């Protein structure tokens, strides 16, 4: 079944019908849109300057370390505003999603591109008030524009699918270089 809408001229005459969408085409589009390894890849948003091997004791220290890396890589337009947005989001509900992973994020006006900073905490985990009660070892801090929700959801979806794989999480914790970390996201 195809969904259509009547189309009218400016003078009030009926022009005919306009095809809005065909469910088969819509389903195909959505599959392609969210397909693993499709047109968008997480590696597009990664930068070796934004991979941080952490040795911190608190959530605040981890957040600060990643924000410092973002600022050092000139990704932040307003460091205090970004920091505040990250903390404000964390107050709403913990970004500790479970499996030892946290995804703090902020979308602000004035940004043109998304970016992801990765924090890897080897050894003891970080208390993050995670949904499953686990301590955090992997942190993915996402930042970018507030007017591109679709792209943001794609990034979040791809990242979530990638980190669900336990072997990838184990490999991330064993990585010793930023290149190794970024290589683990090729094709994601």
Where are these regions (language model features)?
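N-terminal non-cleavable signal-anchor helices
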Residues: 4-5
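Cytosolic covalent-transfer regions centered on His/Cys nucleophiles
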Residues: 13-188
């Amino acid at each position: 079944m195809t969904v259509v809408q009547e189309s009218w001229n400016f003078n009030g005459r009926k022009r005919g019908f306009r095809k809005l969408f065909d469910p088969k085409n819509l389903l195909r589009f959505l599959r392609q849109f969210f397909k693993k390894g499709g047109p968008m890849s997480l590696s597009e948003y990664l930068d070796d300057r934004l991979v941080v091997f952490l040795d911190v004791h608190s959530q605040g220290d981890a957040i600060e370390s990643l924000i410092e890396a973002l600022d050092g890589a000139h990704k932040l337009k307003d460091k205090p505003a970004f920091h505040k947005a990250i903390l404000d989001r964390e107050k709403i509900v913990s970004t500790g999603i479970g499996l030892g992973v946290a995804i703090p994020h902020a979308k602000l006006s004035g940004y043109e591109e998304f970016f992801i900073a990765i924090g890897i905490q080897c050894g003891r985990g970080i208390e993050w008030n995670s949904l499953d009660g686990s301590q955090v070892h992997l942190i993915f801090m996402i930042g970018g524009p507030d007017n591109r929700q679709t792209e943001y959801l794609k990034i979040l979806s791809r990242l979530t699918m990638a980190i669900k794989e336990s072997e990838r999480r184990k490999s991330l914790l064993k990585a010793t270089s930023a290149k190794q970390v970024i290589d683990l996201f090729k094709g994601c």
